[in-house]
């Protein structure tokens, strides 16, 4: 095996500490070609689909991708941002805004840290962002997946890709991983403030009359729970802590799971049938919030805000509210900073003074270094 050459070393260059925010990914454009390319990478990951490759890949390439690429492209088209200050995939736009906001906040607090965002599938890739950090002289990297609840299908595959990339480097940085933050007080407080701010603007559900808050998390196959994945338990804990923070009784909110794919049983109860059932019984108002998604994306903006509303209203429901994800709201950015800072304890968080860097460079040149 050959290892990639390192960038030319600059004596006196300040070593950097970076925070790498990692999210799932998104196609480059809302077109069948771009969506097909993205889905191919995503659904080819054995962490995502645990089916023997010989059985799965022919089905993926021959049936699923040709059918799903066009249909999914239409869904992406329906949520694609085209505003002057926000253009592109919502997940990428909000992820970049989160990184920039976190960078600003940490700088304001006196920390000289680099914040970058990458996608597990699609662009900007983990490999390309790590390479950019390497060329900046980064020597410590905190990998912070934007998955509050750990799952082998999400968090673990992000870690896998980081290790795969670094396995090709000759000079590797120090690495720390944030496994989860599903019960972190700052995360729960940020969720609480997001829901509270929405209710302050749009009115609070009348829980005494049967209105309900649905907390919808991304689903995974039930088999993963049986094999020891903690995701289900962590979602339930997040839901309980948020319900307690909001002062709700157990019957006033419900944890559900969305985005089921294929015919196998996934974690239940499923979100769409739950919304339809609430519509059938004549629920006056249903609010849906997705605590496991720190940034709005196709699963929230299209699957919940559009399809979910249709499920509920067609079945007989009266009023549907989709509560947006936290995106770059200040309480969430503050929580993200608190989580990150707890995990970089002991690392250099500020640049050495310029005169110290110059002294290092001079000493190296005295000993024969070229630069």
Curated annotation (Swiss-Prot):
GO terms for molecular function: ferrochelatase activity; metal ion binding. Disulfide bonds: none annotated. Gene3D superfamilies: 3.40.50.1400. It is found in: Cytoplasm. Pathway: Porphyrin-containing compound metabolism; protoheme biosynthesis; protoheme from protoporphyrin-IX: step 1/1. CDD domains: Ferrochelatase_C, Ferrochelatase_N. Fe cation binds at residues 218, 299. GO terms for biological process: heme biosynthetic process. InterPro entries: Ferrochelatase (IPR001015), Ferrochelatase_AS (IPR019772), Ferrochelatase_C (IPR033644), Ferrochelatase_N (IPR033659). Keywords: Cytoplasm, Heme biosynthesis, Iron, Lyase, Metal-binding, Porphyrin biosynthesis. It catalyses: heme b + 2 H(+) = protoporphyrin IX + Fe(2+). One of its GO terms (cellular component) is cytoplasm. HAMAP family: Ferrochelatase. Belongs to the ferrochelatase family. Catalyzes the ferrous insertion into protoporphyrin IX. This is Ferrochelatase. It comes from Cupriavidus pinatubonensis (strain JMP 134 / LMG 1197). The lineage of its organism: Bacteria, Pseudomonadati, Pseudomonadota, Betaproteobacteria, Burkholderiales. The gene is hemH.
């Amino acid at each position: 095996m050959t290892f990639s050459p390192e960038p030319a070393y600059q004596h006196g260059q300040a070593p950097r500490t970076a925070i790498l925010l990692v999210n799932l990914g998104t196609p480059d454009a809302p077109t069948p070609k771009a969506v097909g390319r993205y889905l191919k990478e995503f659904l080819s990951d054995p962490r995502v689909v645990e089916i023997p490759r010989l059985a799965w890949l022919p089905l993926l390439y021959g049936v699923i991708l040709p059918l799903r690429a066009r249909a999914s492209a239409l869904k992406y088209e329906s949520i694609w941002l085209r505003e002057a200050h926000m253009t592109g995939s919502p997940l990428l736009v909000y992820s970049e805004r989160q990184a920039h906001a976190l960078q600003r906040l940490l700088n304001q607090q006196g920390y000289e840290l680099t914040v970058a965002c990458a996608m597990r599938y699609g662009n900007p890739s983990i490999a390309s962002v790590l390479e950019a950090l390497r060329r900046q002289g980064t020597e410590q990297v905190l990998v912070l997946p934007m998955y509050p609840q750990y799952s082998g299908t999400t968090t673990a595959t992000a870690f896998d890709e980081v290790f795969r990339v670094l396995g090709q480097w000759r000079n590797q940085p120090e690495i720390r991983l944030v496994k989860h933050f599903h019960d972190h007080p700052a995360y729960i407080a940020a969720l609480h403030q997001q829901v509270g701010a929405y209710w302050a603007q749009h009115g609070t559900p009348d829980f005494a009359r049967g209105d309900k808050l649905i907390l919808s998390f991304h689903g995974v196959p039930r088999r993963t729970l049986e094999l020891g994945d903690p995701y289900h338990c962590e979602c339930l804990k997040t839901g309980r802590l948020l319900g307690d923070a909001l002062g709700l009784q157990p019957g006033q909110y419900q944890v559900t799971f969305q985005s089921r794919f294929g015919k196998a049983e996934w974690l239940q109860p499923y979100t769409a049938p739950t919304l339809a059932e609430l519509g059938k019984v004549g629920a006056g108002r249903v609010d849906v919030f997705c605590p496991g998604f720190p940034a709005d994306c196709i699963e929230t903006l299209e699957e919940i805000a559009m399809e979910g509303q249709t499920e509920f209203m067609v079945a007989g429901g009266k009023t549907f509210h989709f509560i947006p994800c936290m995106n770059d709201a200040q309480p969430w950015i503050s929580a993200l900073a608190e989580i990150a800072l707890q995990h970089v304890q002991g690392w250099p968080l500020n640049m050495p003074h310029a005169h110290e860097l110059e002294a290092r460079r001079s000493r190296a040149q005295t000993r024969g270094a070229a630069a």
